[in-house]
Amino acid sequence: MGNFLLVHGAWCGGWVWRKVADRLRSFGHNVYTPSLSGMGDRSHLLSANISLQTHIEDIFNIVEFERLTNVVLVAHSYGGMVATGVADRIPDKIDALIYLNAALPQNGQAMLDLISDKRKNTVIRLAEQEGAGVGIPSSLIMETGIEDDREHAEFMSRTCLCL
């Protein structure tokens, strides 16, 4: 079956893919849902040294160390930045690249280049005020798309600073 590598977005971790991963596994696929450095269950690693390049390396290493080929790389939100970098680095190992409400950068663009100047200024200000200049606080989450109140509360309780 297929090798699915699911890349989460900002403020969360690999846990966000649990239901999707369970469903894909029920069809016999191999599914990987890593948390990016400094996020999710790896939030204790958050530091000023973590960057988009670190996150690209996180996902690249999954492909390399698991010796994956024919990968279906699925990205959500900020994960689109990461997946784009990975796909550029190892295009021969990626069968499909799926952007699920994800950032779709052009070469050389940063995440902040994809948002309005007003939002960019807010992000920078809050990162300095609430994120010690290192991370972006989850107070910036505008919409989760989760309609069930209990699931929304569960999601928000697990959010963390992101880069």
Where are the regions that the model predicts?
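Structural signature of beta-strand start/N-cap positions in the alpha/beta core
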Residues: 3, 30, 70, 93-96
